[in-house]
């Protein structure tokens, strides 16, 4: 495994599903980061910044003031091609809560990180990768929880997640 994100930070949600074990079982087979990073919904992808952790926390607290906890429902899987890496990502799809997640993502990039993204944000949990053009398993379960906080992590030596702080919604 190539460790390309070591030392970077990212902003994400660690959802607390009662049936999260089903997600973990699939990730164990398809996701090389299974052992070092719990299932998560990315809000800001790994980034480098000279901004201190305190400043980052203060900016995120300003964003979170306008937000309340919200429910998400996830179900279904989809493939998303990464032409640069010559692979397909397997996503667990968000069915409800998409609007809130996209708004949060956009606010983070616009007001916290102060730049625009040049891609369409698709809220999801990455279940893994495959070189195949189809998914070889079924996942018909529904995953439901209330999102109450966002996490900021620093990515460690072996791509492990080191949560620096969390912000309550």
Model-predicted segments: where are they?
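Histidine-dependent nucleotide/RNA phosphoesterase domain, centered on the 2H-phosphoesterase fold
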Residues: 1-169
